[in-house]
């Protein structure tokens, strides 16, 4: 019998009960759901590039790009178009199907919007999906980016509403939800997840996933990040999260949002191959590929491909699934179950 449910009314106690399951039971449930929708041996690959680095005015306590903390990070202006396109071509050649561009802003300036839209169009012309993360968006900005052809927009919720004030004070939780509303309304696909290991409690991890799963439409991509502790940030000396709690978070995300891509995101550089293998089994089916995620380390491409070979995994080819038609995806899952269980842009200012 199928365990797959697409719901938007999850209660906190239901989610906490999933987290409390014996590990074998939780992994079995998550993996069974994963196999109903996706090929469990395919992983979608994205490449993430920082197109504008550092000097962010926000006070996110985990972030080395905040201007409020002395992390030794050198700020950089918005990258030149050819620099971005060179990176995109390299990503495509390495097997990435999606190219994500991130800027350390509170929100994009109007004067930069024409250039950002051109960037989207140029990358799409290479035959890649496009994603951006630029901070908060107004409804008008979301529509502009959608009209330019941007496929995905990333804006993470970070943590639960209850713990959020311990992480950031310069942007409200509602600000983040409003941006996601604008992105959905524009027709772009939503990429939204969070970070674990920031000193939060287990109920906060449940609360983060509750917020994501109870959105009007589940995010198409759900990045789950393990905190990367950076010297100079307020979170640099936090205790490490039990790795098995990270696996549990991946598994519960898969159960709550069965049609979403669950991305094994930041923190993989410090994860063992065995831990990553457990995450893939638990339902993670997307990674960021390349030696750096914005400003934090990531496994070398050769290491990732070596791990894929050892696990029998392969990069996903062609177009990725979307949540545009939940009933069609559910029908497909049911059928599958029946068969088998110059570097910088001169005009930009910081």
UniProtKB/Swiss-Prot annotation:
Keywords: 2Fe-2S, 4Fe-4S, Biotin biosynthesis, Iron, Iron-sulfur, Metal-binding, S-adenosyl-L-methionine, Transferase
Sequence positions that bind [2Fe-2S] cluster: 100, 131, 191, 263
A GO MF term: 2 iron, 2 sulfur cluster binding
Binding annotation for [4Fe-4S] cluster: 56, 60, 63
EC number: 2.8.1.6
Gene3D superfamilies per UniProt: Aldolase class I (3.20.20.70)
Recorded metabolic or biological pathway in which this protein acts: Cofactor biosynthesis; biotin biosynthesis; biotin from 7,8-diaminononanoate: step 2/2
Radical SAM core domain mapped to chain residues: 41-268
Catalytic reactions on record: (4R,5S)-dethiobiotin + (sulfur carrier)-SH + 2 reduced [2Fe-2S]-[ferredoxin] + 2 S-adenosyl-L-methionine = (sulfur carrier)-H + biotin + 2 5'-deoxyadenosine + 2 L-methionine + 2 oxidized [2Fe-2S]-[ferredoxin]
Cofactor requirement: [4Fe-4S] cluster; [2Fe-2S] cluster
Cofactor, how bound (note): Binds 1 [4Fe-4S] cluster. The cluster is coordinated with 3 cysteines and an exchangeable S-adenosyl-L-methionine. Binds 1 [2Fe-2S] cluster. The cluster is coordinated with 3 cysteines and 1 arginine.
InterPro entries attached to this UniProt entry: Aldolase_TIM, BATS_dom, Biotin_synth/BioAB, Biotin_synthase, Elp3/MiaA/NifB-like_rSAM, rSAM
GO biological process, one term: biotin biosynthetic process
Subunit text: Homodimer.
Function: Catalyzes the conversion of dethiobiotin (DTB) to biotin by the insertion of a sulfur atom into dethiobiotin via a radical-based mechanism.
Family designation: Belongs to the radical SAM superfamily. Biotin synthase family.
NCBIfam families for the chain: bioB (TIGR00433)
Name of the protein: Biotin synthase
Species in which this protein is naturally found: Shewanella sp. (strain W3-18-1)
């Amino acid at each position: 019998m199928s365990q797959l449910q697409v719901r938007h009314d999850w209660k906190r106690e239901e989610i906490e009960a999933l987290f409390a399951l014996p590990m074998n039971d939780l992994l079995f449930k998550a993996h069974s759901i994963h196999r109903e929708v996706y090929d469990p041996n395919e992983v979608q690959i994205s490449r993430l590039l920082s197109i504008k680095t550092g000097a962010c005015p926000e006070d996110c306590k985990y972030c080395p790009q905040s201007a409020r903390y002395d992390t030794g990070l050198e700020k950089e202006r918005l990258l030149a178009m050819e620099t971005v396109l060179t990176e995109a071509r390299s990503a495509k050649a390495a097997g990435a199907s999606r190219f994500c561009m991130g800027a350390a802003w509170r929100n994009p300036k109007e004067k930069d919007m024409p250039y950002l839209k051109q960037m989207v169009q140029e990358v799409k012309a290479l035959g890649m999906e496009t994603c951006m993360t630029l901070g908060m968006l107004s409804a008008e900005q979301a529509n502009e980016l959608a009209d330019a052809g941007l496929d995905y927009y990333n804006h993470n919720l970070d943590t639960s509403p209850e713990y959020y004030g311990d992480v950031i004070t310069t942007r409200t939780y509602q600000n983040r939800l409003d941006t996601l509303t604008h992105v959905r309304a524009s027709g772009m696909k939503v990429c939204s997840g969070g970070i674990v290991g920031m000193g939060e409690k287990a109920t906060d991890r449940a609360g983060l996933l509750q917020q994501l799963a109870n959105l009007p439409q589940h995010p198409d991509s759900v990045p789950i990040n393990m905190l990367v502790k950076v010297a100079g940030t307020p979170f640099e000396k936090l205790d490490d999260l039990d790795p098995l709690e990270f696996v549990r978070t991946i598994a519960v995300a898969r159960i709550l949002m069965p049609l979403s891509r669950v991305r094994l995101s930041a923190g993989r550089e410090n994860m063992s191959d065995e831990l990553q293998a457990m995450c893939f089994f638990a339902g993670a089916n997307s990674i960021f590929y390349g030696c750096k995620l914005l400003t934090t380390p990531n496994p070398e491409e050769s290491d990732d491909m070596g791990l894929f070979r050892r696990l029998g995994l392969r990069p996903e080819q062609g177009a990725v699934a979307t949540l545009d038609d939940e009933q069609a995806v559910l029908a497909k899952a049911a059928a599958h179950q029946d068969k088998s269980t110059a570097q910088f842009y001169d005009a930009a200012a910081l």
